[in-house]
Amino acid sequence: MATVTASSNFVSRTSLFNNHGASSCSDVAQITLKGQSLTHCGLRSFNMVDNLQRRSQAKPVSAKSSKRSSKVKTAGKIVCEKGMSVIFIGAEVGPWSKTGGLGDVLGGLPPALAARGHRVMTICPRYDQYKDAWDTCVVVQIKVGDKVENVRFFHCYKRGVDRVFVDHPIFLAKVVGKTGSKIYGPITGVDYNDNQLRFSLLCQAALEAPQVLNLNSSKYFSGPYGEDVVFVANDWHTALLPCYLKSMYQSRGVYMNAKVVFCIHNIAYQGRFAFDDYSLLNLPISFKSSFDFMDGYEKPVKGRKINWMKAAILEAHRVLTVSPYYAQELISGVDRGVELHKYLRMKTVSGIINGMDVQEWNPSTDKYIDIKYDITTVTDAKPLIKEALQAAVGLPVDRDVPVIGFIGRLEEQKGSDILVEAISKFMGLNVQMVILGTGKKKMEAQILELEEKFPGKAVGVAKFNVPLAHMITAGADFIIVPSRFEPCGLIQLHAMRYGTVPIVASTGGLVDTVKDGYTGFHIGRFNVKCEVVDPDDVIATAKAVTRAVAVYGTSAMQEMVKNCMDQDFSWKGPARLWEKVLLSLNVAGSEAGTEGEEIAPLAKENVATP
């Protein structure tokens, strides 16, 4: 367990702290710690009664208090008699830090659970100087490797969720500018050498936060979260959390009723390290067997290793993943289970499809497109946006030519290498291709060569470009997602919301979200071996594109567009399913929530530095 310093008696209450002119924590330190409650510059100090009641303070405010505050207008009706206390821990949280689906989930799912009346926190590293997160002045001491480190917490309250950021130089010093490509390593495909220490620190800090942060931003909940909580650990970076919970806390009578759900967003990244590195984790020898792992690869070392994700699968109380079909794939065998299939078969693995940000991705309000539209005006609007897209990327402007878009990371998982080889087989059709993505330098070079190989027919843009991503999503007729494996996928969800028909590989969440012939076209199942491009996959991709283009301009295409736009991919449905799973863990005080809108008025957008 960590040691809390004296400054932890003061914690962030609201973002009004900095607005009141306090420039540093030194002002707070001048307050005398008396046995009485006091408020200063948005901070609240613990008094003696607080310390005796910290566990009970994690519960919702009383009905009497709720009645007093009922005069305040909220965005929707919420009844919060008793809700769960849910804490999400991850290496990313959108929009502050995001490389893909993980950041989107931690950005979107927590507000949806909060909207159902639960108390929700997210905990993520503070990679940058986020201008909307304030220093709580809470400092804890955590042992990382053979050193004791001081760790601070920053906080902001958005859309009913306590957003907590773990502050330490091990996170902040490594990231300069955009966090997108530097969260895990200096360049794509290269990890930081001290990632074990970085994420060990994150897991331990996450277990301290519910007890030491006395957060009062919500008028529905007050005080520390306490011990009756559900931790949701996401991917290998947080895999140590169930181990630390058991060894450092429950062994000492703390968090006795807490539970851990481990959510797999991408099983390809498991946290495999040298076997001798186990000593860096400061865990008892009794957990070593959960980490013990053998594979046939030479990275990071040949032979025996430790595997963080394996340990989380075995030690967590429940295992989830991000789509039902992906859950089936994970237990199907060594290839798609990436050598963890036999351990997953020992557990109950459930899949819940992800939602999407229906505010950012909304064709009727999208700030990046000049013409707004909905399901009733899509037929008239899309050709005009297509012409703007063609002009923007330098293709001949012709609304009658079908445009196929690709948006994603340029790497083997996303199948960009398969697509590049397939393009030559369907470029004879009356079609244009736009590829937007960044990633491996070799693959970036491949897409940049398309314009020379197929002038007036194909173009590649190897840049991070949000406005262009929105324009492609709205202006293209088809979006292609040729992934070798895809746990859930968001590109196809965005596309369908904009009436852009997806052409997808038959894997993971793509199977769950795209119905062949109704809301899109399926290519088939790809070979998951990434070392080479399977010629059969190239042929299947070209055939699927040919089939889609044949439907273009027909009444069947118009019907498919409307079917796509008629789907509901908001977080409301997934939140109900998540709630059901979390309630099944029977943490004390947990009761079902109430359907409603955001507890706090919805911010126009989360503010995060680039």
UniProtKB/Swiss-Prot annotation:
Residues the record lists as binding ADP-alpha-D-glucose: K98
Location of this chain's protein in the cell: Plastid, Chloroplast
Swiss-Prot/TrEMBL catalytic activity: an NDP-alpha-D-glucose + [(1->4)-alpha-D-glucosyl](n) = [(1->4)-alpha-D-glucosyl](n+1) + a ribonucleoside 5'-diphosphate + H(+)
Enzyme category, top tier: transferase
Transit peptide: 1-79
Gene Ontology CC: one annotated term: chloroplast
Tissue expression remark: Expressed in roots, inflorescences, flowers, fruits and at much higher levels in leaves.
Protein name, entry field: Granule-bound starch synthase 1, chloroplastic/amyloplastic
Organism, scientific name: Arabidopsis thaliana (Mouse-ear cress)
